[in-house]
Amino acid sequence: MAILKVDTISGIGTEGPVFEGDIEFTSQNFLTLPKGDTIQRGRGRGLIVANYIQPANYNTSEFITIQSMGNSIDFGDTSAAVRSHATLASSTRALSASGYVAPSNVNTIEFFTIATQSNSTDFGDLLGGSGSYAPISNETRGIFAGGYAYPATFNNIDFVTIATTGNSQDFGGMTTLRADGNRSAVNSSTRGLIAGGYISPTGTNNIEFVTIATTGNSQDFADLTAGRSNFTGLCSSTRGVFAGGTNPSNNIIDFVTIASAGNATDFGDMFTGNSVACCSTSNNTRGVIIGGDLQPADTFTNTMQHITIATTGDSLDFGDMLTTGAYRNATSDSHGGLS
């Protein structure tokens, strides 16, 4: 039973009720008021793009509702079966770029309309063709940093305007050339962090940052709690969280405050154990870590696990993907760069 008492309701039949003056809400349970316009209130979708199930790539994509635990649902397909690609998004459009399409790496960029289940559409091309880019985005701009195409490693950074199809443009370069791509990224609406990667003979703990709205080379930020590659990153508008990885394999979750340069701090552990090549997505409160290659058994999993970004602690079960797999990539319409 709910009781709503107001002095005046106006606009009936035209623009809906308008509440004027002081309004007081009393609830015996939890009360969350909506914010934003109608489209914004519908946000919260995580998109998981393509897949790798040893020994083959797949072009299938799936989606989840981040705030509601449960299994993934089929979304659509990329134009080619791909792995080690990079995905990023505005609140309406998701881009998937580069990656390995047998027998070589590609430089293609495709896009999905996040609210509509459908196949991808051609967007344009990156300046170079490689895999394992670190993706960064806000509502306007998408950035792809680094890249790896055996045996070559790249430190270039490209950018695109997400709302406008076309080829990428040069943004700058990364300060640290990592001997293997496989780095991760998190971002707010203004700053992007690029973390980890492989510098022989082990994973690096280096974190660099870029200012999204301006072009230029990356700058030193701080260090992860442990050097690693093949791991994932997710974020709220203030906090970036990194999970899993290899060199060596681990179940580490650590975090940084994006606006303040400083070393990462322990967050908790992944309940699945050591996970390599998992991916992740988030809204401003919840992060979801998806799939991966569990070590040392070398077993691909379809498990999804979640964390509350603002509070530390171990991950908890979220649901299952339709298929097992690793080397996917994921994004959302409500990640930290959009909040």
Language-model features and meaning:
Residues 2-339:
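Polar, enzyme-active/binding microenvironments
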